[in-house]
Every structure is written in C-alpha cells, then in structure tokens.
Amino acid sequence: MEGHLLAPFLEKDLEKEITFPFLALLVSGGHTLLIKVSSIGNYEILGQSIDDAAGEAFDKTAKILGLPYPGGPQIEKLAKQAVFKKYIFPRPLMKNLKHNNLNFSFSGLKTFALNTFDKIKQESLINKNINLHQEKAEIAYAFQEAVTDVFIKKCKQAALSTGIDKLIIAGGVSANKYLRDKFNSLEKEIKLKTYYPSFEFCTDNAAMIAYAGMQRLLKGEHSPLDT
C-alpha cells in the first residue's frame, strides 16, 4: 500500500508541493486505511476497515445490481442516472466521531443494498410500473453517497484532531469522480488541500512500486534478494 500512498508524487507538479506531514486515505479492493504520514516509512494508522474494504463493497454491491466487474466504475456510471435520489443508506461507525473513532465498516452497506433491491424486486412483481433499471440507479447513487459521506466526515475529523492540512487519497476507489468532487468541496470548507494520483496510477501499477522502492533506497534501506 506504500506504493498507492506515494502515487501522487509521480506527478511532476505535485512532487515538491506535497510536504510532510500529511494524511492519507488509501481506498482499494483490499484495503481501507486512514493514515498519518510523518515521513517515508513513518506511518500511523488512525483508522481502518473492520470488515469489507471500500472497493470490495463497491464490487459486491455492483454484483447485487447485476453489474460487471470491476464494480467501482460501474456503480459510478449507473449512479449518474439517478433522478429521484430517494434512498438514504446508513453511515456506519459514525457515533463517537469526536472521540476519534476513525475506523470504517462497509459490509452493512452492501447488505442494505441487497435488502433494498430484494424488496423492490418483490414489489415489481405486483406493480408493473416499477422501473427496475431506474431503481438500480437510485441504489447505486445512495450507496456511493453513503461511502463518500463517511470518508468525508472521517477525514475531516482526522484533519481537525491532528491539525494537518494536507490529504492524499489513493487506491482504485480514488478514481471515483463523485468522491473527488465532494472532497474538493471539503477543501473549501476547512482548508484541507487534497491530492490524488492521475487516473492511470489509481489502480495497481509498476510505476508507484518503483517510486516507493526508490525512496527507500535513497534512505539507505536495502532488502535481501530472496525476499
């Protein structure tokens, strides 16, 4: 995950702009981590998922809605077709936020999506006016909105409690434009400058691993060839 964390440094115009310390929200199919980064290799985990990673929840919710893999881009695309925005999904682990409860939980959102869609399908057997495709779009929007809202509030609390005014968001989920737009609004609200990798560097790639390795080498660190 260090490669994802440092991916924005691959951008020429950002390499000198991003200074330590900063916060990092790493969101992928396998991980969801909120980290305080003091220097290369000096990381403090402030919060993490206690069940499904965010990207995993996107994939599973997409499967529930009959969408192909990978689910993240499919959910984002379908959510743009939402018109009524009538569903409100829960925001897990938001109690005691002011006491720095910065962990995440997304398995319940997936289950909520499943139960909501199952109920709609049952109703559609009786009410032929129900547009299942539109209902899927409404669910996709509500799910995406809930995940993003949790990220926003947790990162805001982390910034306020640490006094850090820079945030990197990286990993596959960071390619979501809805998420980026919402964090741009947060930047104006609390002056939290947010950085992202280019879209081509959001998913796993060799460039970010090479950069992370180079930074370790510059620090004089070496790894045995057999590891």
Predicted region positions:
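Conserved phosphate-binding catalytic cores of ATP/NTP-utilizing and phosphoryl-transfer enzymes
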Residues: 1-22, 212
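Glycine-rich phosphate-binding loop plus the immediately following alpha-helix
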Residues: 2, 38-83, 109-119
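Glycine-rich beta-strand-to-loop/alpha-helix junction loops that act as flexible
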Residues: 28-30, 167-176
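A contiguous, well-structured pocket-lining segment that forms one wall/lid of small-molecule binding clefts
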Residues: 77-167, 176-190, 217
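Short beta-strand scaffold segments in enzyme catalytic cores
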Residues: 6, 24-26, 32-36
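Conserved phosphate-binding/catalytic loops in two-lobed NTP-binding clefts
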Residues: 166-167, 184-209
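Glycine-rich phosphate-binding/hydrolytic loop that grips phosphoryl groups
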Residues: 4-6, 197-227
